[in-house]
Amino acid sequence: MFIDTAKIFVKSGKGGDGSISFRREKYIAFGGPDGGDGGKGGNVVLVVDPNMTTLLDFTYKRKYKAEPGGNGAGSKCFGKNGKDLHIKVPMGTIVKDAETDKIMADLSKPEDSYVVAKGGRGGKGNCRFTTPTRQAPDFAEPGMPEEERWIKLELKLLADVGLIGFPNVGKSTLLSVVSKARPKIANYHFTTLKPNLGVVSIEGVNNFVIADIPGIIEGASEGVGLGLDFLRHVERTRVLIHVIDISSVEGRDPYDDFLKINEELKRYSVKLYDRPQIIAANKSDMLFDEEKFEEFKTKVEKHGYNKVFKISAATKQGVDDLMKEAARLLSTILVTDLEISEEDRFIEEEKRFTYSIRKEDNTYIVEGSFVDRLLNAVNVNDPDDLRYFHKVLKNKGVMEELMEMGIEDGDVVRLNDFEFDFLL
């Protein structure tokens, strides 16, 4: 079975809480605060495993959670950092945010890894909050919260050459002839419902991987049939071999088939459409009118496709020359990473300092991830904490922005469920 998509839930570890503690030793008066910091929460990290070839494991386990950080303690003891959780994925895995469908990472090399959920920062102990005017702070920061999200994993085949074409044109037969792959072969449409891979060995030439991409039909670029799933597998190939049934035994016109498949490629991705393409006019052993091939070749060449081979996968006629041309083309094309456009790329929000302010009547509402983190870190009922809270708002520019918006004495400022009256 070839599983090429999976959806999993990942959750990093929460940061450990800072400690509120004071030094208590005989003969040492006013020992001062000695609460240690909390440990950092563990990250969730996706790591490429070159030995994995499918996403099948993720059908059995779908939720992954890293260790939280340990809490701080007295005597300035710091909490233990939580262990990172490493999740192995196959090479060629695309990571997407499940909510936005934006691409987060392209794990295409053996050494690639990606932190998909960052552990929360450990909270500061009260020994961190001493100042010349605050010698005995009796508050500490709780650990920062964990990150959690659903992500989608897509495995895109790392094949060098992709066999494309309508169903039942002989792609699977060709793959079985040029490699040791044994795909299912039968005389009906959509025999191949999953991509098959094979390795082609040519004496004196580097081996290359060839993939039989399941049949693409009209409307594939719009999701008709299994179209989008099939087209996804073609993206990483460097050379395409477009297999055409030149015999027309099913009543289809070879040139019309050629145009339709290329139109679907173009609609899906112009870059995919522009990829080097070799035309393989297959089933020539069943062709009784040689002029039909020459006519087809002339029409195709007008579109700029000058590599047209007459082959028969069943009798192996012309197959060796076809594979040698594919190898020659590959030697001229560098392996490149999948290009990700800015609109498709997932932008990691800088969560710590993100906020917005809006006004409703005489109430100014401050909201955002910065607010959530700040309120999580302080006890607004404690005078020391409250002074620290106002200092942070001032340092981060919140107070200045409120004044620029025209806030006046007595106006209410609301941060989540906490409100206070503004005073100049």
From Swiss-Prot:
* PROSITE patterns (UniProt xref): G_OBG, GTP1_OBG, OBG, OCT
All copies of the Obg domain together span: 1-158
> Which SUPFAM superfamilies does the entry link to?
Obg GTP-binding protein C-terminal domain, Obg GTP-binding protein N-terminal domain, P-loop containing nucleoside triphosphate hydrolases
Which terms in the Gene Ontology molecular function aspect does this entry carry? Answer: GTP binding; GTPase activity; magnesium ion binding
Q: Where is the OCT domain?
A: 345-424
Any one annotated GO CC term: cytoplasm
Transmembrane regions: none
Gene3D superfamilies noted in UniProt: GTP-binding protein OBG, C-terminal domain, GTP1/OBG domain, P-loop containing nucleotide triphosphate hydrolases
Q: Which residues bind Mg(2+)?
A: 172, 192
Ligand binding (GTP): 165-172, 190-194, 212-215, 282-285, 312-314
Q: Name one GO biological process term.
A: ribosome biogenesis
Swiss-Prot/TrEMBL keywords: Cytoplasm, GTP-binding, Hydrolase, Magnesium, Metal-binding, Nucleotide-binding
Residue stretches making up the OBG-type G domain? 159-331
- Localization, UniProt: Cytoplasm
What family, per the record?
A: Belongs to the TRAFAC class OBG-HflX-like GTPase superfamily. OBG GTPase family.
Q: What does this protein do?
A: An essential GTPase which binds GTP, GDP and possibly (p)ppGpp with moderate affinity, with high nucleotide exchange rates and a fairly low GTP hydrolysis rate. Plays a role in control of the cell cycle, stress response, ribosome biogenesis and in those bacteria that undergo differentiation, in morphogenesis control.
Q: How does it assemble?
A: Monomer.
Q: HAMAP family annotated for this entry?
A: GTPase_Obg
Q: What protein does this entry describe?
A: GTPase Obg
